[in-house]
Curated annotation (Swiss-Prot):
It is a lipid-anchor. SUPFAM superfamilies: OmpA-like. The keyword Cell division applies. Residues 1-21 form the signal peptide. A lipid is attached at residue 22 (N-palmitoyl cysteine). Keywords: Cell cycle, Cell division, Cell outer membrane, Lipoprotein, Membrane, Palmitate, Signal. Belongs to the Pal lipoprotein family. Residues 147-166 are annotated as: Disordered. This is Peptidoglycan-associated lipoprotein. A lipid is attached at residue 22 (S-diacylglycerol cysteine).
Length: 166
């Protein structure tokens, strides 16, 4: 019981730390060059999170899911947040858009296909959790919508993502 409480506290604290470090109120360049560790937290950029939120609410706030280089495999940490989103989608019937993105390496055509594979991986997981495919719209932007413009691993890692848009 003590370990469960500690685990929930640690998860919430980590989500809040990522949220505080990643939130931005900028204009068109918001997030450009931001220092986000895509392997931290639940593998997602959470935005602002209130300290009184439950673990489920913290997971619900996660809407960006990061991927390894040249991969469309979901990370286990991302699956936890997607479980909460699946529960919500089944309950309310809302539609969401899954936007697949890549870093700039590779050809435009390859990156469009990789972005689509990433969006499909999230879609497949949500459908396996009971979400209707009709609720999920997929789009791939490939390398066209970077959140970080640097030419380094940290920037590329921030761009290898799927964003869940409501």
């Amino acid at each position: 019981m003590e370990m469960l409480k500690f685990g929930k506290f640690a998860a919430l604290a980590l989500a809040m730390a990522v949220a505080v470090g990643c939130s931005s109120k900028g204009g068109d360049n918001a997030g450009e060059g931001a220092a986000v560790d895509p392997n931290a937290g639940y593998g997602a950029n959470t935005g602002a999170v209130d300290g009184s939120l439950s673990e489920e609410a913290a997971l619900r706030a996660i809407t960006t899911f990061y991927f390894e280089y040249d991969s469309s495999d979901l990370k286990p940490e991302a699956m936890r947040a997607l479980d909460v989103h699946a529960k919500d989608l089944k309950a309310n019937g809302n539609r969401v858009v899954l936007e697949g993105n890549t870093d700039e390496r590779g050809t435009r055509e390859y990156n469009m296909a990789l972005g689509e594979r990433r969006a499909k991986a999230v879609q497949r997981y949500l459908v396996l959790q009971g979400v209707s495919p009709a609720q999920l719209e997929l789009v791939s932007y490939g390398e066209e919508r970077p959140v970080a413009t640097g030419n380094d691993e940290q920037s590329w890692a921030q761009n290898r993502r799927v964003e869940l848009r409501k």
